[in-house]
């Protein structure tokens, strides 16, 4: 367990801040997150946080523990994001409306220089999160939309630009080229553009990874021009447009639409009936593309930022 930087004890709970979780604490966080997801219909911790629970050396962890030893609240702080520190927090559904979310948020705010614009995610955009943000003088900053569509019925045939062919990702062969293309395609994206080989390999190691659903588009010389990485969620089963990117030099030729359709057809052929994706509300071009392909708004995740 990492060193305890702060401890505030009240009559019923203890808030601890540390730089590392042991395996038992990681299991408690995952159990807490699962309970919240079942109640809220939205995962409170994104994939990169779940992966980083055991490995993120620079992360800070705030845990809220009852006298019984049950973890009833958790917050994750990543101080390394180039756009500024970013955090997540979750309180167990049976322990809400008791001020625990406020205590975790106060701990997060106290862990970051007041001059730095800390951002905190609210997954599902619930009114209670908006009220908590207002109480702590945080303003609405970024909106990440979740869009969904049914996969029933025929999907249009993808039409690739002349000379472009599509194939599946080959682990160990395409890694470096994909990382370079991803960085170029998402140069202005606050999270995706930061991925390197460690982030790619961490996801290749996940049980859900399937190279057959990781589609690459390349020119006649074998240079990667775009990709559509799909992911299949279980319980309930839904296919995701996990990451879709196109080389900026290849924009305007319909490659993004073709890759999207190819991935959706792959998911439909795998027997899935629904598809989902995440897109920034401010990315109007992408929102238009997905809307034209039949996607509709399902939910939203929001960041709140310190003024």
Language model features: what each stretch is:
Residues 1-11, 79-86, 92-164, 304:
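Acyl-donor-binding surface of acyltransferase catalytic domains
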Residues 2-52, 65, 159-193:
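Short amphipathic alpha-helix that is part of the acyltransferase structural core
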Residues 18-23, 33-112, 119-124, 224-238:
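Conserved donor-binding loop and adjoining core beta-sheet/short helix segment
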Residues 68-73, 141, 221-226, 285, ...:
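Glycine-rich acetyl-CoA-binding "A-motif" of GNAT/NAT acetyltransferases
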Residues 91, 244-246, 279:
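Hydrophobic adenine-recognition pocket in adenosine-nucleotide-binding enzymes
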Residues 97-111, 243-248, 252-269, 287-292:
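Conserved acetyl-CoA-binding loop-helix of GNAT-fold acetyltransferases
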Residues 136-155, 261-307:
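Active-site/acyl-donor-binding loops of N-acyltransferases
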Residues 186-220, 224-235, 248:
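Phosphate-binding active sites in nucleotide-utilizing proteins
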